[in-house]
């Protein structure tokens, strides 16, 4: 005779069959219902519990599906052997100390971070209309797409890059992926090593390369970009550069330095490569942009071109793309032929139409006007708040950030604390020193204005002046 301790509560909100299933499973795990025990018939148990036969049947079927019960023809249900979880040692493991409470997060009054963009500039209505039209007209969006990227998007990108960035490629050379870091991580195993990166530079690129086992050396940046002289002295076989807008200094690599870089790669054909991250190339305010390094090298040159839509559209639109030299395509396809695409076809086809129907270039023109006005307002506010000679601005002509180098600066740690206290979110040039050995970077603010509100530009200069004064006072009293 099986004695069950099951108690069901019709008012609990949990279905009765679910309650019965949980109760019986618990008794089987605890050993109260031993292996081999024959369970009561469904009608009998239903009568004992005052529930319907369907309720008992549903619970039994769930228990059988999960291996607690075995159904034997014309015999009923029997409890299966259950391997209990190993018991914990007496006293259990030593409990970790309770986490310390997090310090309160102060509200951000001025967002001067370098990765921000202005969501108010996003073309919501156009983007939504294109997506709606695609939903009604493109049932293939629900099927598997090309792992290298949707053909329509790759065609649109090839035409756009040729016209506006001088990139020489066909659609078959373009790979679309969910973010620059993702593509860089796939590219790294295809190239020789070691690799050279810029310092100050992009910490994420360095981390991705190192995570893929690439030995990296950090080479200095001067007023023309990465030092090719230092590159020649290194043993690097790959060079990662941001020539259109060196991040975070804002330096643009001139044509002469670009030619030197290409000559460096050409001295060892097939053994040296340049990874060109065309970061913020869309945002050049005062002069025409130089053509890409890839365009100078040609479709089968030593340059791999990388770019992303995270700045021109929105960070949440995870569409980045890479242009591979012709001779690397067979290597790529062999290594990644079984990989799936990482960007939805829906977003890819939306972007393809956004480009081919002319919306993208108009959107960029609108952004350039808005960001240029914001840059001018920020620079004017800084020049008004600080006395002549107290502050030197640099990196104004490209990208969405500028540098503000302080004369006789307080320690960077004091600047960080003072900025946080005033609700200012910013970076310091030393944050991007990838060697930790560049004292000249101290006292230089990296001020992004992509997320800065237009109405905040007038007062941000005085607030930063206040931050510097507070940092100096704090460093004197320490």
Predicted features along the sequence, with ranges:
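Residue-level marker for buried hydrophobic side chains located in beta-strands
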Residues: 112, 274-275
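N-terminal basic, amphipathic alpha-helical segments
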Residues: 1-132, 139-142, 327, 333, ...
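Short glycine-rich anion-binding loops that position phosphate/pyrophosphate groups of nucleotides
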Residues: 117, 244-246, 311, 452
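Conserved core of the PLP fold type I
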Residues: 131, 140-271, 282, 286-300, ...
């Amino acid at each position: 005779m099986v004695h069950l301790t099951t108690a069901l509560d019709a008012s609990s909100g949990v279905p009765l069959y679910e309650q019965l299933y949980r109760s019986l499973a618990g008794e089987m795990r605890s050993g109260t219902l031993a292996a081999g025990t024959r369970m009561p018939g469904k009608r009998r148990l239903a009568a004992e519990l005052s529930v319907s036969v369907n309720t008992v049947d549903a619970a039994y079927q769930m228990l059988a599906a999960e291996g607690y019960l075995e159904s034997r023809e014309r015999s009923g249900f029997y409890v299966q052997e259950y391997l209990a979880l190993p018991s914990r040692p007496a006293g259990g493991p030593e409990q970790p100390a309770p986490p310390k409470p997090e310090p309160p997060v102060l509200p951000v009054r001025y967002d001067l971070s370098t990765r921000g963009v202005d969501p108010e500039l996003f073309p919501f209505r156009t983007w939504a209309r294109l997506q709606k039209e695609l939903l009604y007209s493109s049932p293939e969006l629900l099927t598997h797409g090309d792992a290298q990227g949707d053909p329509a998007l790759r065609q649109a990108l090839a035409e756009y890059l040729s016209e506006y960035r001088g990139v020489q490629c066909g659609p078959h050379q373009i790979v679309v992926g969910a973010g620059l870091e993702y593509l860089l991580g796939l590219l790294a195993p295809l190239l020789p090593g070691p690799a050279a990166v810029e310092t100050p530079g992009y910490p994420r690129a360095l981390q991705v390369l190192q995570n893929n086992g690439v030995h990296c050396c950090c080479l200095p940046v001067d007023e023309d970009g990465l030092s090719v002289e230092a590159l020649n002295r290194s043993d690097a076989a790959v060079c990662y550069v941001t020539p259109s807008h060196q991040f975070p200094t804002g330096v643009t690599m001139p044509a002469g330095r670009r030619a030197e870089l290409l000559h460096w790669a050409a001295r060892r054909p097939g053994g040296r490569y340049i990874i060109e991250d065309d970061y913020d190339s869309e945002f050049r305010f005062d002069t025409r942009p130089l053509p890409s390094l890839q365009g100078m090298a040609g479709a089968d040159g030593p340059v791999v071109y990388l770019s992303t839509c995270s700045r021109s559209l929105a960070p949440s639109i995870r569409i980045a793309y890479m242009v591979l030299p012709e001779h690397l395509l067979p290597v790529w396809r062999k290594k990644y032929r079984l990989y799936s695409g990482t960007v939805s076809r829906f977003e890819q086809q939306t972007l393809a139409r956004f480009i081919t129907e002319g919306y993208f270039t108009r959107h960029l023109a609108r952004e350039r006007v808005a960001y240029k006005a914001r840059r001018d307002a920020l620079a004017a506010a800084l020049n008004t708040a600080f006395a002549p000679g107290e502050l030197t601005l640099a990196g104004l002509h490209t990208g969405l950030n500028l540098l503000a180098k302080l004369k006789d600066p307080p320690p960077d740690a004091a600047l960080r604390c003072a900025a946080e206290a005033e609700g200012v979110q910013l970076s310091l040039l030393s944050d991007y020193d990838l060697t930790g050995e560049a004292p000249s970077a101290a006292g230089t603010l990296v001020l992004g204005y992509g997320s800065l509100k237009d109405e905040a530009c007038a007062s941000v200069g005085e607030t930063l002046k206040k931050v510097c004064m507070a940092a100096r006072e704090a460093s004197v009293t320490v």
